[in-house]
């Protein structure tokens, strides 16, 4: 399971079901459990749980921060303005959206599209951890600061490190025009 800081809210420990329970679920069971989740306050105002979308054998997984208004209404990640930008970027690198799996750090929309709180991320951590375990992607692409802080490093600064490829390869990829 991912390393999450414990906080207040409705998810006092590793979750109401326990880590072992989550790690035994298949895709359909995981999604069914997630759709009825009440582990944090975001559940109170959501229209839909935004579980994730894409082939469940994809080699590439994109992880965003959380659903926006359009995503909450449609129950699918990256269908609003962010989805249009993602589609444009995927087209530029000749990557077919139907070949990737897309999920978010949290499965319900934070109010006013604010960043997900640490407690909300923690409440959703079991869902995301199991999605990653089931998918077993070759590559995880972080979309935004919140996911980069969890998967790359806690003090990740997107304005400073957005063009860096983490790891020991020593490679750099330019992501903006100079």
Task: Please tell me what each predicted stretch does.
Residues 7-9, 13-18:
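Residue-identity detector for glycine
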Residues 22-178:
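A polyanion-binding, active-site-adjacent surface
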């Amino acid at each position: 399971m991912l390393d999450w800081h414990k906080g207040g809210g409705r998810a006092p420990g590793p979750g109401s079901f326990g880590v072992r329970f989550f790690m035994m679920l298949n895709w359909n069971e995981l999604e069914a459990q997630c759709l009825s989740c009440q582990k944090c306050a975001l559940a109170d105002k959501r229209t839909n749980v935004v579980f994730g979308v894409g082939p469940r054998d994809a080699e590439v997984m994109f992880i965003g921060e959380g659903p926006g208004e359009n995503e909450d209404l449609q129950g699918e990640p990256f269908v609003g303005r962010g989805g249009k930008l993602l589609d444009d970027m995927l087209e530029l690198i000749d990557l077919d959206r139907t070949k990737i799996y897309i999920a978010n750090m949290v499965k319900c929309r934070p109010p006013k599209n604010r960043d997900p709180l640490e407690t909300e991320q923690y409440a959703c951590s079991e869902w995301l951890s199991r999605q990653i375990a089931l998918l077993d992607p070759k590559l995880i692409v972080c979309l935004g600061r919140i996911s980069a802080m969890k998967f790359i490093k806690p003090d990740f600064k997107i304005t400073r490190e957005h063009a860096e490829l983490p790891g020991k390869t020593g490679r750099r990829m330019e992501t903006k025009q100079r």
